[in-house]
A protein has these predicted regions:
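Short alpha-helical hairpin
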Residues: 11-35, 146-147, 222-230
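A cross-kingdom marker for long, charged
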Residues: 224-227, 231-234, 240-260
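Acidic, low-complexity proline/glycine-rich segments
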Residues: 1-27, 208-215
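Long, non-globular segments of proteins
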Residues: 8-10, 36, 171, 244
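Alpha-helical bundle segments that constitute or directly flank the non-heme di-iron/ferroxidase center
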Residues: 15-20, 35-65, 94, 159-170
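Amphipathic, well-ordered alpha-helical segments in soluble domains
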Residues: 22, 50-57, 98-101, 131-135, ...
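Helix-loop segments that flank and shape redox-cofactor active sites
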Residues: 25-38, 55-86, 150
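Active-site-proximal alpha-helical scaffolds that flank and shape metal-associated catalytic sites
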Residues: 74-212
Length: 260
């Protein structure tokens, strides 16, 4: 029997909602080139605003880390919180690269990803899709500076990062599988000119992305196991805290896909 891990436990919860969050009609339409440029533009613009919350959560999580006073050897991976620090630094680099990629594709395919009003600064609430508003609430609940648990103070933030990256990868991997069925259709014939099938889907399903997700998964599971051990009370506490984040995250992810 496989040993217990936190992430494998979370994946047994809310399976129907996980399926809805990773197999939406929006994804199916993206895979077959049936999304219009205005719809993709609005969704991408919201996804870009999601990135800003992601960046703020990274900063908040960095503040929870208790880094060791003792130096870490140059060729050593370091303890859990040092490894989490390294992952968060990589996450910041990746999210900035992703935003530049968004802008490059948008410019080449004629997609408008600017949601700001006449002032060029603010975004009216009605311009935000339901999923973005839910993510902003979720990120905000973890970045308000409130005192967290003394047991694994980084837990909720790490679970949220793993969960959002895991669901995103699984969603676009499912879309990639659907796209393979439309392989005979030229991307230039797609309603978006090929932006999804040629640019975005390959970018969101590559090997580097899944390795990035799996790295955090390993850090999260090992960090929890180090603290929990065989203590069933601590295990239950960690499961409950993580499950609450997982539930809210799935709701936000499901709501992030527009109706088509």
């Amino acid at each position: 029997m496989a040993s217990w891990t936190l992430t494998s436990h979370l994946l047994t919860l809310h399976r129907d909602q996980f399926a809805r969050a990773t197999q939406s009609r929006f994804l199916a339409h993206a895979a077959s080139g049936k999304l219009s440029k205005p719809l993709i533009s609005h969704w991408l613009a919201n996804d870009r605003l999601y990135m800003q919350g992601y960046i703020r959560l990274t900063g908040s999580l960095l503040r929870t880390l208790q880094l060791p006073a003792k130096p870490t050897p140059s060729k050593a991976a370091g303890g859990i919180e040092v490894r989490l620090l390294d992952w968060l630094v990589d996450a910041l680099v990746n999210i900035r690269r992703e935003e530049r990629f968004f802008m490059d594709v948008a410019e080449r395919y004629g997609l408008d990803v600017d949601l700001t009003g006449e002032d060029g600064v603010s975004v009216r609430p009605e311009r935000k899709i339901a999923g973005l508003r839910r993510f902003e609430e979720l990120f905000g609940g973890l970045t308000t500076g409130r005192q967290g648990s003394s047991l694994l103070p980084w837990l909720e933030g790490a679970v949220l990062f793993w969960a959002t990256e895991k669901v995103y990868f699984e969603a676009w991997s499912w879309a990639k599988g659907q796209a393979e069925g439309a392989a005979g259709k030229a991307c230039e014939e797609d309603e978006d000119g090929g932006a999804m099938r040629r640019e975005f889907i390959p970018n969101w399903t590559n090997g580097e992305f899944i390795r990035f997700v799996e790295t955090l998964e390993g850090i999260l599971n090992e960090g929890v196991q180090e603290v929990v051990g065989r203590d069933e009370r601590l295990k239950k506490e960690v499961e409950d805290r993580a499950a609450a984040v997982w539930r809210d995250l799935l709701g936000a992810e499901e709501a992030f896909w527009p109706e088509v």
